Curated annotation (Swiss-Prot):
Homodimer. The N-terminus is blocked. One of its GO terms (biological process) is sensory perception of smell. Binds the chemical odorant, 2-isobutyl-3-methoxypyrazine. Keywords: Olfaction, Sensory transduction, Transport. It comes from Oryctolagus cuniculus. Belongs to the calycin superfamily. Lipocalin family. The keyword Transport applies. This is Odorant-binding protein 1.
Amino acid sequence: EQLIELVGPWKTVYIVHFNGET
């Protein structure tokens, strides 16, 4: 449960960061 809450916003940040690097 706690992991999902942390992964929620983290996933978005990771996608945005990866998209900006490409």
